[in-house]
Every structure is written in structure tokens, then in C-alpha cells.
């Protein structure tokens, strides 16, 4: 019992290193859609078409390596006015990187993304795999790189990288995506959520991986239109008090 209490305290206290973490957006009639791992020619063009068709907005957390490989897709995202943020260069777990490698990865990613949009401040990013969002050491390394870093986490994940597992057809995948949206919309906590989706998820072995995001997004946009839910941007957290740097009052999953 004492050991569990000590672990919980360690996850809540720091030496002033905790950064703000964004997990929700204001109001029950809005959600924020976010995509990790892009850009990808398998997904980005269709995603942008769907967002434009439904007059919706999204935040794209891009991997530097993919952004460098597909610059025209990043240009298209920026041209449509969607937010572009960092998701690391190689999509490596940041809680397993050395401080030097950590800083190089972040700097290299921003050097790529800065070609397409101004460097944001506060500097919102998403950690690959969500790795280290609960680690004071990772927060300290982020703060030493840029003092204005804020972590964009999420409050609803579709775990979409699993939807094509053992899936034998596009039609079956469509059913799974539709069911995932029905379940999400029935959740009382859905309104105000930051939603986590993936573009052609890194590490997925399924041949249908590239079809997941377009199918899921289409079902999502149809669903929120029926419920009168709008899309909004991920805004910087306003909880930047001195005390919040030392104590986290709310656990983040």
C-alpha cells in the first residue's frame, strides 16, 4: 500500500518541471479531431477532402521524416488552414531517448515543419505513443528544450490502429469503423473531447491500415453532424500557474 502511494505521489509531484497538458476543449457541443503519424499519400488527400466537405477542422501531429518525404501533402494541410504540430521525427518513444537525442529529434522536426507554418508559441506537441506524458524527467527535458512547450494529449482514443487486425475485407473494416463511432457518440463524455486518430499508423502491419482513417473520419463527421456537434481547434492550456509546475492535481491517462 505504501509503495503504491509513493508511486502515485511521484506521478503527481516534480521539481517544478510539469508542463501544461491539453486533454479537452471547452463546451459539450464541440470536439477537436487530431491525427497522428502523417502525412501519408494513403490518407491525407482523402482526409482533407472530407474535412473540407463537412467544413470541419483538425490538428495534424506530423512526423518529421514523413513530412520531409511528402512536402506537398504538408503544404496542402497548411493551405486548408489546419493546425500543424510536432509528433517527433522518427516516431520513437521519448521516455527511452537520451537527453541529447531527445533535443535533436525535436529540433530536427521543427526545422522541417517551420518551412510550412510559423513556429507556434506556446509550442504544442504530441509525444509518440503518448510516451512520457506522466514522467517528470520527460517534462524536464521538454522544458529545457523550450520553456513554452505544452503537451497535447487526448481524452478519447478509437485505438484505430487495431481496427484492421484480422480484417478480411474493406466492407468488414467499414462496419468496425461505423461501430466505433456509434460507441463514441453514445459516451456521455464525448462532447468536449480531444479525439485521437492516426494516418496510416506507423507500425501497423495490415494491408488495410491506410483505409482506416478515411473510413473512421467519414463516419465521425456524419455522426457529429446529426448531433449538432462542431469541430474546434486545440487551444493552449491556461493552467500555467507556478503551483501547477510542482503538483499535478489531476491524473492524465
Model-derived regions, located:
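Catalytic domains of cell-wall/extracellular-matrix polysaccharide-remodeling enzymes
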Residues: 68, 91-230, 236-239
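Hydrophobic beta-strand scaffold residues
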Residues: 58, 84, 150-151, 231
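Sequence-level motif detector for i,i+2 pairs with an aromatic at +2
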Residues: 28-30, 190-192, 243
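Active-site beta->alpha N-cap acidic-glycine motif
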Residues: 2-101, 105-108, 112-115, 121-122
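Juxtamembrane helix-loop transition sites at the ends of transmembrane segments
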Residues: 57, 174-176, 249
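C-terminal accessory extensions appended to soluble enzyme cores
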Residues: 235-253
Amino acid at each position: 500500500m505504501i509503495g503504491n502511494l509513493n508511486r502515485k505521489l511521484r506521478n503527481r509531484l516534480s521539481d517544478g518541471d510539469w508542463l501544461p497538458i491539453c486533454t479537452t476543449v471547452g463546451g459539450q457541443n464541440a470536439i477537436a479531431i487530431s491525427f497522428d503519424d502523417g502525412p501519408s499519400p494513403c490518407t491525407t488527400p482523402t482526409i482533407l477532402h472530407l474535412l473540407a466537405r463537412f467544413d470541419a477542422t483538425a490538428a495534424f501531429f506530423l512526423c518529421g521524416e514523413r513530412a520531409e518525404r511528402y512536402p506537398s501533402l504538408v503544404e496542402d494541410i497548411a493551405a486548408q488552414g489546419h493546425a500543424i504540430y510536432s509528433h517527433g521525427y522518427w516516431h520513437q518513444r521519448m521516455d527511452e531517448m537520451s537527453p541529447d537525442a531527445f533535443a535533436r529529434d525535436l529540433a530536427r522536426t521543427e526545422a522541417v515543419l517551420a518551412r510550412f507554418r510559423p513556429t507556434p508559441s506556446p509550442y504544442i506537441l504530441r509525444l509518440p505513443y503518448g510516451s512520457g506524458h506522466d514522467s517528470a524527467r520527460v517534462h524536464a527535458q521538454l522544458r529545457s528544450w523550450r520553456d513554452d512547450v505544452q503537451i497535447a494529449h487526448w481524452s478519447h482514443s478509437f485505438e484505430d490502429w487495431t481496427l484492421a487486425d484480422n480484417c478480411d475485407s474493406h466492407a468488414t473494416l467499414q462496419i468496425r469503423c461505423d461501430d466505433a463511432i456509434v460507441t463514441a457518440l453514445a459516451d456521455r463524455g464525448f462532447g468536449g473531447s480531444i479525439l485521437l486518430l492516426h494516418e496510416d499508423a506507423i507500425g501497423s502491419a495490415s494491408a488495410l491500415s491506410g483505409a482506416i482513417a478515411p473510413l473512421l473520419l467519414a463516419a465521425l463527421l456524419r455522426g457529429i453532424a446529426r448531433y449538432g456537434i462542431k469541430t474546434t481547434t486545440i487551444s493552449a492550456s491556461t493552467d500555467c500557474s507556478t503551483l501547477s509546475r510542482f503538483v499535478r492535481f489531476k491524473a492524465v491517462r
